[in-house]
Amino acid sequence: MTHFIFVTGGVVSSLGKGISAASVAALLEARGLKVTMVKMDPYINVDPGTMSPFQHGEVFVTEDGAETDLDLGYYERFLRRAKMTKLNNFTSGRVYQDVLNKERRGDYLGGTVQVIPHITDNIKERVLRAGEGYDVAIVEIGGTVGDIESLPFMESVRQLMVELGHKRTMLMHLTLLPYIKSAAELKTKPTQHSVKELLSIGIQPDILICRTEYDVDADTKRKIALFTNVEARAVVVCKDAKTIYQIPRGFYEQNVDDLICERFGFTDLPEADLTDWDNVVEALLNPEYTVRVAMVGKYVELPDAYKSVNEALLHAGIKNRVKVQIDYVNAEELESQDVSILKTADAILVPGGFGERGTEGKMKAIQYARENGIPFLGICLGMQLAVIEYARHVAGMPEASSTEFNRSTKYPLIGLITEWLDERGELQQRSLESDLGGTMRLGAQKSELVEGTKTREVYGKAEITERHRHRYEMNNRFIEAIEQAGMKISGYSSAQHLVETVEIPEHPWFIAVQFHPEFTSSPRDGHPLFASFIDAAKTQHQKSK
């Protein structure tokens, strides 16, 4: 029987609902419970797949190929025993699309389709389905309490809490405790009004997570409890931390897991063992020295656009006991600049992306890394550009390009994938006229790594599974020419023999991959490719001293 914890936010947005929810999930998992998580997004887009990274940040790809909110990345990084799927994230757009499709088919037998019950029932069905087979499902509602867009979701939560009952549901509400310097005190009124907003729609919070920059004394906690109908021990302080990976320990010290287990009747559970989290924090806060990675992209003004890459580099730093400083380099600006901005880098990374804008700057950075022996990692578009750069400057194809940028190029090193097998083994077909949304090669795919290559050595095995999100792929017609020039194809897809990884054997560390390894990195386990990349950056750092 699944128990549900609903997570809402009030006062302001960006309080960290996702991180707080994931930290609670990690704590419950450490008690031996089977935990999953769900994110409900109120926007009308069907999914974030076609949204600008400047609008939404990163699109996180699940194993089964769902394009989801970046919060699902937090969920997977904090949980070890649960992988997110397309069931774990849905939007208002997805719900309305589903309901309208049913109406067009006549499923409602001519009845009037309304927000209540049709939309709310659809939301409830999705929540219950996502929670099947788990002890606890933690469900985050995007946005802020009081937003008009989230009202159907809040009503669905209210109904579920009534239908499932007190012993199977809880609500955790995040609020802000602002500090007024002129008065030298924390203000509780915004929290009171936020809870009042919840009460007005029939929902009583059970736990309050109070975000603050300062310590909160017992009197303030009692005051908050008095005005919000919450137990004083359920007023949890979440003070700004040096790293988000300290938060599970902070919640444990305030007995958040005990509150939940008591409510749900979970007895005879072991104490939470947070040793792994303590080790992560210790390594993160006590690095031996700093290495610098230049990340060359076109969305660098918003680091959340590369959230999983940033986190994977952080995790690799933990594994190597170094601090990884990311220097963001605007690819467009680099096109008109010299490469001096890259000279302080111990390693260079070109992440995934779409479109022609900034590609010449990225290839400029790739050429610099290749010619100067700087460790280089290319991801998705970064791999495609590494192949094009090599073809232009080494393999004698100066007009080499991708059909994404130039359909009439003389040397189409990169072309549209027209056919491939999806994660279910079913044939997928695409053309240049296909819709942009949901038409990519998505999700986990198997690859075979070539024996004797550095990539095979890094992974330590012949077959790997990594997640994909792309429409274009290296053109197999040019494999022979590229390999004769010195670049090695080090990995192929198991099903279609598509190029998955390339490397330059004569270079100290030059690997580029078509997939997205960042999606499977975690703070406790890291990822072999990123760990090896940062190890190479350490070697480069020592050489340059």
UniProtKB/Swiss-Prot annotation:
Signal peptide: none
Binding-site positions, UTP: S13, K187, T188, K189, P190, T191, Q192, K223
Residues that, per the record, bind L-glutamine: G353, L381, G382, M383, Q384, E404, R471
Catalytic residue list: C380, H516, E518
Pathway the protein takes part in: Pyrimidine metabolism; CTP biosynthesis via de novo pathway; CTP from UDP: step 2/2
Residues at which ATP binds: S14, L15, G16, K17, G18, I19, D71, K239, D240, A241
Catalytic activity: UTP + L-glutamine + ATP + H2O = CTP + L-glutamate + ADP + phosphate + 2 H(+); L-glutamine + H2O = L-glutamate + NH4(+); UTP + NH4(+) + ATP = CTP + ADP + phosphate + 2 H(+)
PROSITE patterns: GATASE_TYPE_1
Domain of life: Bacteria
One term of GO molecular function: ATP binding
Residues the entry annotates as binding CTP: S13, D147, I148, E149, K187, T188, K189, P190, T191, Q192, K223
Region feature (Amidoligase domain): 1-266
One Pfam family named in its UniProt record: CTP_synth_N
GO terms, biological process: 'de novo' CTP biosynthetic process; pyrimidine nucleobase biosynthetic process
Activity regulation as described: Allosterically activated by GTP, when glutamine is the substrate; GTP has no effect on the reaction when ammonia is the substrate. The allosteric effector GTP functions by stabilizing the protein conformation that binds the tetrahedral intermediate(s) formed during glutamine hydrolysis. Inhibited by the product CTP, via allosteric rather than competitive inhibition.
Complexes and interactors: Homotetramer.
Annotated HAMAP family: PyrG
Protein name as annotated: CTP synthase
